[in-house]
C-alpha cells in the first residue's frame, strides 16, 4: 500500500484545499491510477487507510456532494503544471455516452499542445445530442474571465460548432477561429452573386490538395475566409476562418488533440464511461479528479521521455503516446509499493505534480 504522505506534501504546495481534502485527493488519485477506472466501487476498494471500502465509498460521495471545488484554480494549475504558454490554440468538443437510458453529455474546452488537448473547463449537458449556442458561449465566457481574449491564438472545432449566433459572437469578441463547415452549407460563389453548397466550390479541384478561395465569402451572415479539400474517399474538409491563412487546414487538424484526450479519459485510460454518477455537479467534480490524474500521468510521460525518448515507428508516429507511457509507469510504481526502490520512485513521481 502506497504511503501517500509525499503526495500530500506536494499537493499542499500547489492547491489551497484544507488538510482533510488534500488527504482525500491523494488517496483518490493513487487509487484511480491503480484500478484504471473511474468506477467508484473499484476506486474505494483500494484506497489506502484503515477504513473499510464502504467508508471510503461514502467519503467519495460526500466529497462529490458537498465540496465546492475551485474549478478556476484547477484550470490555472493545469496550465502551470504542463508548462503551457499563451497564446493558446483552444479546442472545444463534446463527448457523450449512456448509462442505461440516461444520457451523459460533456462539453469540454481544452488547450491543444504536443498532439493532445489539455482540459481546462467543462460543463455537463443535461440532454442528449448537440450543444446549443448559449452553452458554448457560456463556456467561452468562463474562459475569457480567467485568461482574457489575448490568450487565444484561435479556436478550432468540428461541424457541430457552426451557427449564425455562434459565429456572430466569435466575430464580435474578436476571437480567431478555424471551424469546419458541413459540406452542404451555403457559401457565396466566386462572383458573389449566388450561394452554393460549400462542396461545389471544391468539386473540380484535385483530391488531397487544399485550396484557399480568393477573398472573403459570406457564411451565415459573416464575411469569412474559406479553405477546403476534397479527400480521396469523396468527403470534403471545408474550413472557415476569421483570418486569411494558407495554414487553415493544418491549423484545424490540431482539433484532433481533443479526440486523443477523450480516448485517454475513456478506453485508453480511466474508463470514464464506467461511472455511475449522473448528477450534473457531481460528475463535473469527478471529471476534475480525473483531469488531475491525467495530468500526473502525462507529466510522468514527459519526464521519462527526457531521459529515454520514445521510439518513432516507420509510419512516423510514436510507438506509444506520452500519456500511455507515463500512465503505465505510474501504475507499475503504485502497484508495487512493497519494494523499497519503487517507494523511492514514488517520491520522485509525486514531485511531478508540483508547479514550482
Task: Report residues per predicted region.
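Helix-turn-helix DNA-binding elements, focusing on the entry/boundary residues of the two helices
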Residues: 40
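Short, compositionally biased leader-like segments
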Residues: 78-80
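An active-site-proximal beta-strand-loop segment
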Residues: 93-106
Amino acid at each position: 500500500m502506497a504511503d501517500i504522505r509525499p503526495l500530500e506534501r506536494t499537493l499542499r504546495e500547489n492547491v489551497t484545499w484544507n488538510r482533510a481534502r488534500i488527504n482525500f485527493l491523494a488517496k483518490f488519485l493513487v487509487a484511480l491510477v491503480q484500478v484504471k477506472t473511474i468506477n467508484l466501487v473499484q476506486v474505494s476498494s483500494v484506497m489506502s487507510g484503515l477504513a473499510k471500502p464502504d467508508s471510503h465509498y461514502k467519503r467519495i460521495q460526500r466529497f462529490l456532494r458537498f465540496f465546492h471545488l475551485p474549478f478556476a484554480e484547477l484550470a490555472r494549475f493545469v496550465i502551470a503544471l504542463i508548462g503551457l504558454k499563451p497564446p493558446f490554440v483552444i479546442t472545444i468538443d463534446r463527448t457523450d455516452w449512456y448509462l442505461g437510458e440516461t444520457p451523459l453529455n460533456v462539453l469540454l474546452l481544452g488547450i491543444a499542445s504536443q498532439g493532445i488537448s489539455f482540459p481546462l473547463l467543462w460543463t455537463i449537458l443535461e440532454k442528449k445530442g448537440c450543444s446549443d449556442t448559449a452553452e458554448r458561449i457560456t463556456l467561452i465566457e468562463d474562459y475569457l474571465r480567467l485568461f482574457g481574449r489575448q490568450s487565444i491564438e484561435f479556436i478550432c472545432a468540428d461541424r457541430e460548432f457552426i451557427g449564425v449566433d455562434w459565429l456572430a459572437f466569435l466575430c464580435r469578441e474578436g476571437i480567431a477561429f478555424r471551424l469546419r463547415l458541413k459540406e452542404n452549407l451555403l457559401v457565396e460563389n466566386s462572383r458573389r452573386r449566388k450561394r452554393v453548397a460549400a462542396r461545389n466550390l471544391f468539386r473540380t479541384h484535385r483530391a488531397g490538395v487544399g485550396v484557399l478561395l480568393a477573398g472573403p465569402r459570406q457564411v451565415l451572415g459573416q464575411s469569412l475566409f474559406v479553405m477546403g479539400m476534397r479527400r480521396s474517399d469523396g468527403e470534403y474538409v471545408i474550413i472557415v476562418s476569421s483570418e486569411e491563412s494558407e495554414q487553415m487546414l493544418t491549423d484545424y487538424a490540431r482539433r484532433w488533440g481533443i479526440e486523443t484526450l477523450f480516448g485517454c479519459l475513456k478506453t485508453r485510460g480511466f474508463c470514464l464511461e464506467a461511472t455511475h454518477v449522473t448528477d450534473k455537479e457531481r460528475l463535473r467534480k469527478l471529471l476534475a479528479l480525473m483531469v488531475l490524474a491525467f495530468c500526473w500521468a502525462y507529466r510522468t510521460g514527459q519526464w521519462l521521455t527526457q531521459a529515454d525518448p520514445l521510439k518513432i515507428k516507420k509510419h512516423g508516429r510514436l510507438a506509444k503516446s506520452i500519456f500511455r507511457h507515463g500512465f503505465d509507469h505510474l501504475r507499475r510504481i503504485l502497484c508495487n509499493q512493497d519494494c523499497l526502490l519503487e517507494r523511492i520512485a514514488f517520491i520522485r513521481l509525486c514531485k511531478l505534480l508540483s508547479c514550482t
